[in-house]
Amino acid sequence: MIIVTGSFTAEDSFLADALALSLEHVRRSRTESGCLSHAVHQDVENLSRLVFVEEWSDRAALAAHFAVPGSRAFAKAIGKFAAGTPTLSIFEAQRVEL
């Protein structure tokens, strides 16, 4: 399984637009093959900071996601809304039973 985390802090004047675009992006992404989960969360300590957590079945599914025109457009649009540089981290993981 591939886990992706990312975040950005929106300029205050763009927060509503950033929220709407982010929700549109995660809802579309959830329909893609290999997407196990995709969510956006608003940081309760900084409401302008949006945090993304994604789970993908494998690297091929994530690569396909990054190739979707909507994903590329989302990344470009976030750059216009962000106050600072967005973060993105990708991890390979396996589920552990306790």
Question: Language-model segments: which ranges?
Answer:
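Short, flexible segments with low predicted structural confidence
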Residues: 1-2, 16-17, 33-35
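Glycine-rich beta-strand-turn "strand-cap" elements at beta-sheet edges
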Residues: 2, 40-46, 74-98
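Active-site-flanking beta-strand signature of metal-NTP-handling nucleotidyl enzymes
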Residues: 2-8
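Hydrophobic packing within well-folded, soluble alpha/beta domains
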Residues: 6, 18, 38-40, 50-52, ...
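Short, surface-exposed ligand-recognition loops at beta-strand->loop->(often short) alpha-helix junctions
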Residues: 10-15
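An amphipathic, aromatic/His-enriched active-site/gating alpha helix that lines ligand/cofactor pockets
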Residues: 20, 28-36, 55-89
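Short, glycine- and small/hydrophobic-rich beta-strand elements in well-ordered beta-sheets
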Residues: 26-51
